[in-house]
Amino acid sequence: MKNVIIVCGLNGAGKSTLGKVLAEKLNYRFIDMEDIYFPKDDPNYMYSNPRPFEEVERILLNIISENDSFVLASVKGTFNKEIVSHFKCAVYIETQKETRIKRVYERSYNKFGERILEGGDLYEKEKAFFDFVKSKDENTVEVWLSSISCPIIRVDGTLPIGNNAELIAEKLGNQF
């Protein structure tokens, strides 16, 4: 039996950060969808060449076949039925829009520095991404969550990561 826990939430919610801590706590592998979508084939900008969705699904199915238990960080899990059937639990990180936008900007600045500022070589690309994050429908994850049948654990994305990981592990212990 596969134990795939999807940690979902909008950009900047804290999926990767919480997912890594949770995976370590549960002794599961951690997978970040960002790493699957964006191959590291451009050393100057890691988001240059996104993979087609069908290829992403193939890679994810291979990961599922090779691993019994892992935590998957993804905005939402709108994948084919075969993939979704392996989700044993969804963790939804609820985080206010202002906090998320601030985190996204800080993360980009920490990765790319002044290259994201006006006049920098990544300014246009990052500005387009920031605009995308700001315009994203706040209910998009909620709508997806209503379509799945596995248990959903909701956590506050502004609480300490360790506290959220402990809460999730406790709830998972009661469910599995």
Where are these predicted regions, by residue range?
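ATP-binding Walker
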Residues: A13
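Hydrophobic anchor at the beta1->P-loop junction of P-loop NTPases
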Residues: V7
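Conserved phosphate-donor/acceptor-positioning beta-strand/loop module used by diverse small-molecule
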Residues: H86-R107
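P-loop (Walker A) phosphate-binding loop of NTP-binding proteins
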Residues: L10
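Pre-Walker A (Motif I) flank of P-loop NTPase domains
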Residues: K2-V4, D68
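Walker A/P-loop
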Residues: S16
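Small-molecule kinase domains that catalyze NTP-dependent phosphoryl transfer to phosphate-bearing small molecules
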Residues: G113-N164
